[in-house]
């Protein structure tokens, strides 16, 4: 008979074993980076520490060889099934999943993402947001991630990455809050005069989903809002009568 504490310790060990298997896959594929390996290493160490704390608990029942043997055999059967299932998924779909905790909701991880949904979690006061790679359709990239706030003070966001990127497009700017297909790059002109206020000057880049080309359309509106005040009268006084006659004489030669 497996006690409640033994069951919790077993779950912690299985969680650590799962992260160890994911770490092994990353090492075999040569995808070694601090972003991908550090969360897995921390989870493995935390899982073993948690399991040891359960085993050292004063409420833990005394050691019996039969119960220990049953627990070990149960863990062996369950872990074997999980390893086989995960191995099939990884081989068939090339999945790589791991967690990453950060102080920001969407840290710059080198890829662009598009949010496609969110839902309320019963055990949490914060909603879970779901993202997919921006190039999921264009380049058949099946990488996704979900982000959820797990702590308030200080704020900590947990990002769970699922799938493996096959796209070759890396993010240039940290714009993962809203990975949209239309980007507006603001161009602020130098002010000509304090009384001139530019209406708009934008370069709009539209990325077509159905085409492989990018159409650049530049909208440059050189219209200005002019304040009606005595400033213009002082800056541009009216022509005197002599200058007017001079201009009329010049126009007579044309």
UniProtKB/Swiss-Prot annotation:
Location(s), subcellular: Nucleus
Keywords carried by this UniProt record: DNA-binding, Nucleus, Transcription, Transcription regulation
Keyword DNA-binding: yes
One Pfam family matching this protein: WRKY
InterPro entries xrefs: WRKY_dom (IPR003657), WRKY_dom_sf (IPR036576), WRKY_plant (IPR044810)
Alphabetical list of Gene3D superfamilies matching this protein: WRKY domain
Keyword Protein transport applies: no
Family in the record: Belongs to the WRKY group III family.
Function, as annotated: Transcription factor. Interacts specifically with the W box (5'-(T)TGAC[CT]-3'), a frequently occurring elicitor-responsive cis-acting element.
Protein name (database record): Probable WRKY transcription factor 67
